[in-house]
Design a protein with these regions (language model features):
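Bacterial N-terminal signal peptides that target proteins for export
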Residues: 1-15
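N-proximal helix/coil linker or "cap" segments that precede and/or mark the start of modular domains
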Residues: 27-43
């Protein structure tokens, strides 16, 4: 665990694109169609960007995860630690959580997998598809046509198929993905998973849940806040 490279620089995604509910202008979302991917690219980008942020906007600290759906260590974190972190810190209002994509060049299917999650995010279902990407990686990374699988899984979680498939096959969320990638590179990130806690403390790679909690708690204690 080290000091984070360039505090604040990891959030260039938002400043570059002007997107996001917490960091940019809000988007009007129809209550009648919560799981429909909109046709307008700007709206897709705005909704996808804000969907990958979870937790109370007034939370005292922020946790950023830089990740790759095809990375085995990222999957290990998801399976072993992510739900505990979410329960103790995010759902309790202690931390706001932001997921940033940083696919490795040796992972050819990682890019479309990120698109699958961001297109789902445009329909308000980012985290549901995020979980599926990690839990079914062995299926999609070897599929002849992973997009067809992604559409099938999107329907499983209540997303309308036509708009979702259009989003995928036309690379609609690509600007958000490129901004994520460039932002991580400029911040000196070279591998995944990589975490930044409280804009100050970096966690590189997979660590035990005990060490992860200790890192978060150290930031809270340094700010005079209670730990869970």
């Amino acid at each position: 665990m080290t000091r984070a490279p360039g505090p604040g620089r990891l959030f260039l995604t938002i400043s570059l694109l002007g997107l996001g509910l917490a960091f940019g202008r809000p988007v009007n979302v129809s209550a009648q169609e919560p799981y429909v991917v909109p046709a307008d690219q700007e709206v897709v980008l705005q909704r996808a960007d804000r969907a990958r942020v979870k937790g109370d906007s007034a939370a005292p600290i922020r946790i950023v995860e830089i990740s790759d759906f095809e990375c085995p260590y990222c999957r290990q974190f998801h399976l072993e630690s992510a739900r505990t972190i979410d329960s103790l810190y995010v759902q309790s209002g202690i931390a706001r959580y932001l997921w940033i994509s940083f696919p490795n060049s040796t992972h050819p299917r990682a890019w479309p997998a990120v698109e699958a999650a961001f297109c789902a995010g445009a329909a308000g279902r980012f985290w549901a598809m995020h979980d599926i990407m990690f839990e079914r990686v062995d299926q999609w990374k070897s599929a002849v046509d992973p997009v067809s699988l992604f559409v099938q899984w999107a329907v499983e979680i209540g997303i309308e198929a036509q708009g979702y498939e259009y989003c995928l096959r036309n690379d609609v969320p690509a600007p958000l993905q490129v901004a994520d990638y460039d932002s991580a590179l400029r911040s000196g990130i070279a591998s995944t998973p990589f975490f930044v806690v409280g804009d100050s403390l970096a966690i590189r790679g997979v660590v035990s849940i005990e060490r992860f909690r200790s890192a978060i708690d150290s930031v809270l204690i340094a700010r005079g806040l209670e730990t869970p």
